[in-house]
């Protein structure tokens, strides 16, 4: 319940909440926002973009499309604060229509725990080179994965 969520949050000294994992836009964001924003929480979301985020419910929207894994997905959340793309060798021109709705563009190398250091290093290198040659994009790393921190 919303009351249980507020009780749990009150145990922590924080004022920013990030909704992520699975697809958080499947939850009732309007009710969550109406409950949490008056308490002073800044709300962020990382979404695959297939479900539009109701205007005014979330303070920071990160769209991270899963279009390389699921080719038939349609991105419906076309505006936000950041567009974060996992780089698998795709042409960045495929995001030309989408990227104008975002303030920040991030390209992230795929880190695969099932692969060896050399493979992951090549993934990083190819992403780094892509960013170097496309300066409107910035490099984003999931540092905890590279460090082996769970």
List each language-model region with its residue ranges:
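Glycine-rich S-adenosyl-L-methionine
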Residues: 2, 85-94
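Structural recognition of alpha->loop->beta junctions
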Residues: 6-11, 55-71, 131-138
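Auxiliary Fe-S-binding modules of radical SAM enzymes
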Residues: 11-14, 90-150
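Anionic group-transfer/hydrolysis microenvironments
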Residues: 22-25, 48-50, 66, 110, ...
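Short, polar loop motifs at secondary-structure junctions
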Residues: 46-53, 65-69, 87-91
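Short loop/helix-cap segments at secondary-structure boundaries that form the rim of catalytic
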Residues: 51-58, 72-79, 94-100
